[in-house]
Regions:
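Positively biased amphipathic helices and basic secretion/translocation or surface-docking motifs
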Residues: 2-33
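Low-complexity, intrinsically disordered regions enriched in charged/polar residues
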Residues: 10-14, 43, 251
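A residue-level detector for the "anchor" residue at the start of short, highly conserved motifs
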Residues: 28-35, 47-315
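Hydrophobic alpha-helical transmembrane segments of integral membrane proteins
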Residues: 37-44
Length: 315
């Protein structure tokens, strides 16, 4: 394995947004991405707020009609062990990485290795998902991974040895295939998360100060860079502060943190700024606030992840 710092130095290159978007989409971003106060238009639960904002002249009605925000979709870039890459979308194709067969279809990408004895040398693949994208991957052991917008994973094409280890930056949800003899390890820049078989969500964006590990079922052990260990039970979440190295464990409603993989955002008493942090990655927009006081407005509700934002503007 490459040392951890070397791996995460590679992550930084994937957050050169101009390069990434140019490779993935090859088109310029329109000026609609820079609409001031876009934070107050992307949620269907904000009817009363929108009316208030119109009255105060913060976001004129004629300006709202100019906005066209599309939801994200299945797209990513696959980088093979030889350094070549392929753009991924919900189309059917097969390809080979050495002797390993990779199948892509509308359900995502899957790795099929019939004879692992032919794959003794460890080869790695990488999947990079841009803003406005998502992708689903099934590893060779059957583990399923939902990769959210602006995220990256690196993994062996075939797992060898006494553990199954992958590297993650951004947000992923995992359904880990049980294997009592080979624990599954998720490496983030600051944490190692070890499981035998379970369902959990990891949110570890480089531009966010906290790393979240949310357990749905099973049991996970989390080791931080200071050597401290925490063991999570179902419905528990570990919050790790990447700035001071401290962590806390709390009980949560897991739906709030994993519903994105099922096409829904669920909010309960959340600040508008925190909500828009999620929305901005999915709709691929940059959020600006003319009035900073709206950041602290609290909302509860549900937002369909695949809803065209234009329909959300009609109040």
């Amino acid at each position: 394995y490459q040392d951890k710092e070397a791996v995460y130095r590679r992550f930084d290159s994937y957050y050169d947004f101009d390069r990434l978007r140019g490779a993935i989409r090859g088109r310029k971003r329109g000026m609609w991405k820079y609409v001031a106060a876009a934070a107050v238009i992307a949620l269907p639960l904000l009817v009363s707020l929108l009316l208030q904002i119109r009255q105060e002249g913060i976001f004129p009605e004629e300006r709202m009609r100019e906005i066209s925000l599309l939801p994200g979709k299945s797209m990513a870039t696959l980088t093979l062990s030889d350094g070549s890459s392929k753009l991924l979308s919900p189309e059917n194709f097969d390809l080979m990485d050495g002797s390993k067969r990779i199948v892509n279809d509308p359900g995502g990408l899957s790795y099929q290795v019939e004879d692992t004895s032919e794959c003794m040398e460890t080869a790695y693949n990488e999947i990079t998902v841009p803003r406005g994208g998502e992708y689903k991957v099934t590893l060779d052991d059957g583990t399923r991974i939902w990769v959210n917008s602006e995220s990256y994973i690196r993994f062996p094409v075939v797992f060898h040895g006494d553990e199954r280890r992958i590297w993650v930056s951004g947000e992923v949800f995992l359904e880990v295939t049980k294997d009592s003899e080979r624990p599954f390890v998720v490496n983030t820049e600051k944490l190692d998360i070890k499981v035998l078989g379970t369902q959990f969500n990891v949110r570890a964006y480089p531009d966010e100060k906290c790393i979240q590990t949310t357990l749905v079922e099973g049991c996970v052990r989390v080791d931080n860079s200071l050597g401290e260990v925490a063991v999570l039970a179902p419905s528990e979440q570990l919050l790790y502060n990447a700035q001071n190295g401290k962590h806390e464990v709390r009980e949560v409603d897991t739906e709030l943190y994993v519903s994105w993989k099922d096409g829904v955002y669920v909010f309960v008493s959340q600040r508008l700024e925190d909500i828009m942090l999620l929305i901005s990655k999915w709709y691929d927009v940059d959020v600006f606030y003319q009035n900073s006081t709206v950041k602290d407005i609290i909302f509860s509700g549900r937002l369909k992840r695949y809803e065209n934002a234009e329909t959300l503007l009609k109040v």
